[in-house]
Amino acid sequence: MKLQEIKDFVKELRGLSQEELAKKENELKKELFELRFQAAAGQLEQTARLNEVKKQIARIKTVQSETK
């Protein structure tokens, strides 16, 4: 993700409710699980996507803690 995409993503996250953030986090965790499974099987072509998803989950958790 480029810097502007990251800023837009975080801005979008800040507009969501806690329930929506939790739902988005769960979706990304499922995607991360699938990516790890593909990586273990040697089928993953976009290896950078693993780190991208991890960082997106961390951003969601940061926004969640900001709003508590």
From Swiss-Prot:
It comes from the Bacteria. One of its GO terms (cellular component) is cytosolic large ribosomal subunit. Signal peptide: none annotated. The keyword Ribonucleoprotein applies. Gene3D superfamilies: 1.10.287.310. GO terms for biological process: translation. This is Large ribosomal subunit protein uL29. It comes from Streptococcus suis (strain 05ZYH33).
